[in-house]
A protein has these predicted regions:
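Nucleotide/pyrophosphate-binding catalytic subdomain
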Residues: 1-266, 273, 279, 288-290
Length: 290
């Protein structure tokens, strides 16, 4: 490393200092999803980011879905994936496959990636210990999409215990109803519900686009900041992929989470850029008074 490179890196560290001080002991709920889950190099850099956050004094919580891997597993079994309003139609057969992929494949990969750097990740399935309690979801009160749940309540006790032990919870987006039935839960919705229940400082959704685009797919139309009232007007016109994400951000910030962000998980270290730089990245949702 030459002197110029060293000075540039020192500048980056200096820029991070006020953010390190600001976010000490702050809870950051991170939804990890999209193609970053199937790209080993991106999984590695994501794990680095999460470990860095924890060692820097923040309290990261990872919530993950499994769209690409679930679709692949279903294809292998000859089952065609069906979606309605952005939600996967989940039959009794499919929900068992969903749990297997989420817990035994994806969660395991994330936990192992984090623990390869420092042993501090703890895997938790949302349907265990009544962690994520749900009711069956119906679209527009009439369209049945099977075993897909709306989050009713999050029992935060286990999450807090993991955080207080200095570890990182890695939570699979599953839920359970009052009859013991397991449900598939949209990972954005699960992350939002967990952030609300913990009154987190940040909710960060990693996705496969740069953020909310004014004219999709033109990334030059990226919307950097939106207030709640601005977002509320836009939600009805969003496509089925982005709408659940923005609804999750809206719900979180409306319920006391300080800020919500949608960032590009395809970019290495996007999470650190968002948290520790002045410019940030992606789209930020704030309360109307900011």
């Amino acid at each position: 490393m030459n002197q110029k490179e060293a000075l540039m890196k020192a500048g980056v560290l200096a820029e991070a200092l006020p953010w390190l001080l600001k976010f000490q002991d702050c809870i950051v709920v991170i939804k990890f999803g999209g193609n970053a889950m199937v790209d080993k190099s991106l999984l590695h850099t994501f794990a680095q980011d999460v470990v860095f956050l924890r060692l820097a004094g923040l309290k990261p919580i990872v919530v993950h879905g499994g769209g690409p891997q679930i679709t692949k597993r279903l294809e292998e079994k000859g089952i065609i994936s069906e979606f309605k309003n952005g939600y996967r139609v989940t039959t009794g057969e499919v929900v068992g496959i969903v749990k297997d992929v989420l817990v035994n494949e994806i969660q395991k990969d994330i936990v192992n990636a984090i623990n390869a750097m420092k042993s501090m990740a703890v895997g938790i399935s949302g349907d265990e210990f009544d962690l994520i309690q749900v009711k069956k979801m119906m679209i527009d009160q009439t369209i049945d999409i099977g075993f897909v749940g709306n989050v009713e309540r999050v029992d935060i006790k286990q999450i807090i215990e993991v955080l207080e032990s200095g570890e990182i919870p890695v939570i699979s987006s599953l839920g359970i109803d009052n009859k013991g039935q397991i449900f598939n839960v949209n990972a954005d919705s699960a992350a939002s519900a967990i952030a609300k229940s913990l009154r987190a400082n940040k909710l960060v959704l990693l996705t496969d686009v740069a953020g909310l685009l004014g004219n999709y797919p033109d990334e030059t139309t990226l919307i950097n900041t939106l207030s709640l009232s601005e977002l509320e007007k836009m939600i009805p016109n969003l496509d089925s992929g982005m709408r659940p994400k923005m609804e999750s951000c809206f719900e979180a910030v409306s319920s006391g989470v300080s800020r919500a962000h949608v960032i590009d998980g395809r970019k290495p270290h996007a999470l650190l850029v968002e948290v520790f730089t002045d410019s940030g990245t992606g789209t930020m949702i704030t309360k109307d008074l900011e």
